[in-house]
A protein has these predicted regions:
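A glycine-rich phosphate-binding loop feature that marks nucleotide/adenosyl-phosphate handling sites
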Residues: 95-98, 160-166, 230
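Conserved small/polar residues in nucleotide/adenosyl-binding loops
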Residues: 221-228
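Short acidic alpha-helix initiation/capping motifs at coil-to-helix transition points
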Residues: 68-71, 134-141, 209
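A conserved active-site cap/scaffold subdomain adjacent to cofactor or substrate pockets
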Residues: 131-191, 195-203
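Rossmann-fold dinucleotide-binding core
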Residues: 1-92, 100-129, 167-191
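Short, surface-exposed loop/turn motifs that are enriched in glycine and acidic residues
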Residues: 66, 200-208
Length: 232
């Protein structure tokens, strides 16, 4: 099998491909896969992942890392909005600036674009009127389960899965929100530039941790030579 990543843009301009199976099959298909795949710095975004279901396993872990990445962005947004009192436009400007540095990535780029998007009916920032529920297809949960089965830590990924689970429990959250007063940040004096720099560095460090945690189960599985990735 083969993991495929890229979404709509990947379909139009080339995806990232993670093939698994026999080496002979990969070698036979490699010219075609490299031709249709995305390119980064002149290199095809495709490589042999290993035997059997290795390609799908790597794609699963890729999704788990993405779960963590999106949750870290959501946590950063929460602090920007509720602690620093930033508007959607101010946040968009900040994310755009961050995307020019070491945080440059697709998710950071589209975060800025999303924050600039206005709801056509109300004129309000779209992010303020959409349903605050994030569902999941299961790949993040499977990544956490695999890490637990292997005995390797993946706390950032796992907490991102739990955050989505809590997000989907809308009715329960509404009940609890009536029992607990909102955290009162009003009147709290903060050094916005300093806090934003702390947020940027914290987000960068957290990203590194999430990637390391994703590589953990992949590396550990590879070292267990008596098993193939499809056994997990």
């Amino acid at each position: 099998g083969m993991g495929v990543s890229g979404g709509e843009e990947g379909a139009l301009h080339g995806p990232s491909l993670m093939p698994g199976g026999t080496r002979e099959a990969y070698d036979a298909l490699a010219p075609i896969l490299k031709a249709v795949s995305a390119k980064a710095e002149g290199e095809a975004c495709v490589d042999y992942m290993g035997p059997d279901g290795a390609g799908h396993y790597v794609k699963m872990v890729h999704n788990g890392i993405e779960y963590a990445d999106m949750q870290m962005i959501a946590d950063t947004y929460f602090v920007m909005k509720n602690v620093l009192g930033m508007t959607a436009e101010e946040m968009a400007d900040t994310w755009e600036m961050w995307n020019k540095g070491e945080l440059s990535s697709y998710l950071v780029e589209i975060t800025a674009r999303i924050l600039r998007k206005a709801d056509e009916m109300t004129g309000k920032p779209l992010v303020d009127v959409i349903l605050d529920v994030a569902k999941q297809k299961g790949t993040g949960r499977w990544t956490s389960m695999s890490a637990l089965a292997l005995g390797v830590p993946a706390p950032t990924i796992t907490e991102a899965v739990f955050a989505r689970t809590m997000s989907s429990q809308k009715e329960e959250r509404l009940v609890l929100s009536k029992r607990y007063r909102d955290l009162a940040f009003e009147g709290t004096e903060v050094d916005r530039p300093a806090v934003l720099e702390d947020l940027r560095q914290a987000l960068y460090a957290s990203k590194i941790c999430a990637y390391a945690q994703g590589f953990n189960p992949v590396s550990y599985t590879h070292l267990r030579a008596h098993e193939t990735l499809s056994d997990l």
